[in-house]
C-alpha cells in the first residue's frame, strides 16, 4: 500500500489507519 498521511482538525489517518 502507499503510505499517505492526512492530518485533520479532529482525527488523522495514515496508510488507511485512523487514530
UniProtKB/Swiss-Prot annotation:
Q: How is it modified after translation?
A: Maturation of lantibiotics involves the enzymatic conversion of Thr, and Ser into dehydrated AA and the formation of thioether bonds with cysteine or the formation of dialkylamine bonds with lysine. This is followed by membrane translocation and cleavage of the modified precursor.
Q: Name the Gene Ontology biological process terms.
A: defense response to bacterium; killing of cells of another organism
- State one Pfam family annotation: DurB-like
For this chain, the family text in UniProt reads: Belongs to the type B lantibiotic family.
* Superkingdom, natural source: Bacteria
Q: Which organism is it from?
A: Streptomyces sp. (strain A647P-2)
* Sequence position, cross-link Lanthionine (Ser-Cys): 4-14
The Swiss-Prot or TrEMBL record annotates one GO molecular function as: signaling receptor binding
* Beta-methyllanthionine (Cys-Thr) crosslink, residue number(s): 1-18, 5-11
What this protein is called in its record is Lantibiotic ancovenin
Which keywords does this Swiss-Prot/TrEMBL entry list? Answer: Antibiotic, Antimicrobial, Bacteriocin, Lantibiotic, Thioether bond
Under the heading InterPro entries, the entry gives:
Dur/DurB-like (IPR046016)
Question: According to its UniProt entry, what is the function of this protein?
Answer: Acts as an inhibitor of angiotensin I converting enzyme.
Indicate the cross-link positions, Lysinoalanine (Ser-Lys).
6-19
Amino acid at each position: 500500500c502507499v503510505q499517505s498521511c492526512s492530518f485533520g482538525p479532529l482525527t488523522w489517518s495514515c496508510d488507511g489507519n485512523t487514530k
